Amino acid sequence: IFVKINGVPVPPLLKEESQKEAKNMREKYHESPKDNWVEKYMKNNNFSIQENEGGGDCLFATIRDAFANIAQQTSVRKLRKKLAGEVTQDIFENYKEQYDMYSASLVRDTNNIKQLAQDYNLLKQKFETIIDRDEQKIVLKQAKEVKAEHDKLVQEKKVTAQMLKEYKFMKGIDNIDQFKKVIRDCDFWADTWAISTLERILNIKFIVLSSESYKNKDLKNVLLCGQLNDTILEQKGRFTPEFYIMIDYTGDHYKLIGYKK
């Protein structure tokens, strides 16, 4: 999957920094408007951020760009093809089940919200025709309960719609071959399964820093500890990656982070 780039020297390994050296760099750091967010967060001017073509290819592009820095050439197409080859029937069925579940839930929520809105309007009309105070209280209580249920479902529907968005590429996908095909296409955006699987098959480890958390001043969650979503790695119980790749996650985009480039 990787081809050596002739004529491009492989950079030497960086000298390991001691805790004292890292502390000295932080103490000497002076923030500048031109500094990127990682430099500001780490208080270290040696970090760079490399943009890529974006879209659904961004995570694959960070791998391509990272290995290009050590004179190893690959492509997004090759990486997607390699990932597609890891798909099993169980993996396909899991994605299919998730898509079907959220799709059905969205339809159900939409219908229930519509019905509750109708029920509320009927109770409102009924309330306006009632003269008896006690009966008014009963209808008012019913109307409040219906509205509360309606508002609750509206919020749940928003969450369901967001979850369904993550599986939208599964629309019209009915078998494993179709699923493999969509993974080879930019409609599939890398998720936790893709990240864990790419880490295993390429023997790499992503260090994910969240610029979204940094911008929201949620500094405790800048370093994202991704979940392990690969049964083969789980069964091995041990993982010793050959390379570590630092990436910036913006919330919907990945970019490569470099150090002392």
Predicted features and spans:
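Non-catalytic, low-structured ubiquitin/UBL-interacting segments
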Residues: 1-52, 68-73, 93-159, 258-261
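Deubiquitinase catalytic domains
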Residues: 13, 35-41, 52, 168-261
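Alpha-helical interaction elements in eukaryotic regulators
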Residues: 34, 54-55, 59, 75, ...
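Alpha-helical recognition domains of nuclear gene-regulatory proteins
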Residues: 41, 61-62, 66, 82, ...
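Interface signal in eukaryotic adaptor modules for cytoskeleton, membrane trafficking
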Residues: 59, 64, 71-105, 166-168
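Short helix-capping/linker segments at secondary-structure and domain boundaries
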Residues: 66-73, 202-208
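Eukaryote-specific, cytoplasm-facing alpha-helical/coiled-coil scaffolding segments in long proteins
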Residues: 85-91, 108-112, 219-233
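C-terminal regulatory/interaction module of P-loop NTP-utilizing enzymes
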Residues: 158-171
